[in-house]
Amino acid sequence: MIDLKLLREDPDVVRRSQLSRGEDPALVDALLTADTARRTAISTADSLRAEQKAASKGVGGASPEERPALLQRAKDLAEQVKAAEATQSETEAAFTAAHMAIPNVILDGVPAGGEDDYAVLEVVGEPRAIDNPKDHLELGESLGLIDMARGAKVAGSRFYFLTGQGALLQLGLLQLALRLAVDNGFIPMIPPVLVRPEVMAGTGFLGAHADEVYRLEADDLYLVGTSEVPMAGYHADEIVDLSEGPLRYAGWSSCFRREAGSYGKDTRGIIRVHQFDKVEGFVYCTPADAEAEHQRLLAWQREMLAQIEVPYRVIDVAAGDLGASAARKFDCEAWVPTQGTYRELTSTSNCTTFQARRLATRYRDANGKPQIAATLNGTLGTTRWLVSILENHQQPDGSVRVPAALVGFVGTEVLEPKG
């Protein structure tokens, strides 16, 4: 949720953020109205309760002549308090709904606009000239790494098996990511992949995008699309110790996405699938440290991309393409030869205090006063990386060179066609 102090003191900042995202700025005015109504209702109910308490005390010391009128007054006040409390509950619910409807306020410098309005910050490496390149699925099938047909037979479209050295390649990639994280002070975690509704909502993944999330209705649990979700919930309703700097976690999990809005997109191969594996960095820090920590996450992502030896670029994602929780997001996109373009391999988001405010995660400032923490997240390795590895390292004879950093995990320097 956004900071109410900011909303009340400078609502135009929130309106501009909404416009940059392509969202309705009228939601800001609706929240201001709901906030005023809620505060008025609270004040009215408090005042009536105080009056009721005073009237009740007065009955005890009243004369027989005064008592009937005072009793009636106390009864009337009790009814007024009941009505005021009902109004307070209604205004609280309306306020919460209005508050939850507004996404995070973007940071200065984030490009306005939609999916195609990103800013390219850097291009790293030159795409290699490849005559008649094969796509990752053709390579994966010929090398015995990917089996889409049996994945579909078992689970339906957008499912797959990683087989043999394909499984080793992914496991090696994720182990490499986890090793990098641990070497940089992250605590490794294997979190639950099922979470309660309040945790999913707290991270900003419900609301307008609820249809993209798998839900187990009988158990009222959600399958996570990223380990960001359980790691954000890890310190819900807690005061964390940030006295020695940020808390950094690296979560390794399977991830599940319905891809409800992607019909017809990336139907071939493993670029867009319902289940994949990922190592995700997640950070709790003070709001003052958040922007510097965002740059650190990006640097660690770049270090991982250097390990797989592929050309990539870094983009500053436009406001309209940000998730509800993100105030700023950087994507690293790797070159995909058969598509002649760059595709996202990593993202890192600065969620400022948005998630922690929803999840009641705080820290103590220098004066010992509890304050809302900031949260950030960033991909360190995921299944989709195999697409870029296979396509960029393919050889004329149909083999694929294994990046040096992964050779020890896969057990060979070259993946050879089967049969």
Swiss-Prot record:
Compartment annotation: Cytoplasm
SUPFAM superfamilies in the record: Class II aaRS and biotin synthetases (SSF55681), tRNA-binding arm (SSF46589)
Keywords for this protein: Aminoacyl-tRNA synthetase, ATP-binding, Cytoplasm, Ligase, Nucleotide-binding, Protein biosynthesis
GO molecular function, one term: ATP binding
Gene Ontology CC annotation, any one: cytoplasm
Disulfide bonds: none
Name by which UniProt lists this protein: Serine--tRNA ligase
Organism of derivation: Mycobacterium marinum (strain ATCC BAA-535 / M)
Organism phylogeny: Bacteria, Bacillati, Actinomycetota, Actinomycetes, Mycobacteriales
Encoding gene, per UniProt annotation: serS
